[in-house]
Curated annotation (Swiss-Prot):
It catalyses: N-(5-phospho-beta-D-ribosyl)anthranilate = 1-(2-carboxyphenylamino)-1-deoxy-D-ribulose 5-phosphate. One of its GO terms (biological process) is L-tryptophan biosynthetic process. Keywords: Amino-acid biosynthesis, Aromatic amino acid biosynthesis, Isomerase, Tryptophan biosynthesis. Pathway: Amino-acid biosynthesis; L-tryptophan biosynthesis; L-tryptophan from chorismate: step 3/5. NCBIfam families: PRK01222.1-4. This is N-(5'-phosphoribosyl)anthranilate isomerase. GO terms for molecular function: phosphoribosylanthranilate isomerase activity. Its EC number is 5.3.1.24. Belongs to the TrpF family. Disulfide bonds: none annotated. It is an enzyme of class 5 (isomerase). It comes from Synechococcus sp. (strain JA-3-3Ab). The keyword Glycoprotein does not apply.
């Protein structure tokens, strides 16, 4: 089928991060947003720097101060940031100047198809997009799915990740409608917020392998297309 970037997000425990990395996923995500269910305080995240180098370490932020991200990069060795707030294209561009070499993923919360129009504003200021289901109070990890058939055949200007309510049981159905560069799972592979279920992660990878998917080590470069 091709190569697929697989990110497991909302990790809070070192033992689970190491075990999930060993299963062969592409990336691990860590929530740096206070007062959210899967928040990992920086003071408890120094172990991120010891994770295997082959796995992408993605910090998830909402309308962050660039200095906060810089501290996370220094302490935890982040290799990418995922921006889930109202960050403008100019702010994303400035972040790239502030932290060269750190990949930027801009999350778009999709409520209506018209929300996809915003994707084209970010085509030259981030390396990838992430499509997530809209929720009025929460920026992610809601367990709500997108309308996959409705999104089919919509073009995006960058490599992109599909998020929103994905599980080992529905991921192949989602991929039958869409052709993302990657997928992002959180609530669909855990027992409770922040407590990942390693068997569910294993089952996810088995489902993908059964259909011929190979796990990508990195997202495509923006100029490689979708």
């Amino acid at each position: 089928m091709g190569r697929l970037f697989v990110k497991i997000c909302g990790i809070t425990r070192q033992d689970q991060a190491e075990a999930i990395a060993a299963l062969g996923v592409s990336a691990l995500g860590f929530i740096a947003v206070p007062n959210t269910p899967r928040y990992l305080p920086l003071s408890q995240a120094r172990w991120l720097a010891s994770l295997p180098r082959h796995v992408e370490k993605v910090g998830v932020f909402v309308d962050p101060d660039p200095r906060t991200i810089a501290t996370w990069v220094e302490v935890g060795g982040l290799t990418a940031v995922q921006l889930h707030g109202r960050e403008s294209p100019e702010e994303c561009r400035q972040l790239g100047e502030w932290l060269p070499g750190i990949r930027r993923i801009k999350a778009l919360r999709i409520r209506h198809l018209a929300d996809l129009e915003a994707a084209h504003l970010y085509g030259d200021c981030v390396e990838a997009l992430l499509l997530d289901a809209y929720h009025p109070q929460r920026a992610g990890g809601t367990g709500q799915t997108l309308n996959w058939p409705e999104l089919a055949h919509r073009s995006l200007p960058l490599p992109w990740l599909l998020a929103g309510g994905l599980t080992p049981d529905n991921v192949l159905q989602a991929l039958s409608h869409l052709q993302p560069s990657g997928i992002d799972l959180s609530s669909g592979v855990e027992r409770q917020p922040g407590d990942k279920d390693l068997h569910k992660v294993w089952r996810l990878l088995q489902q993908l392998e059964s259909q011929g998917w190979q796990i990508a080590s990195a997202l495509p470069q923006p100029n490689q297309g979708l």
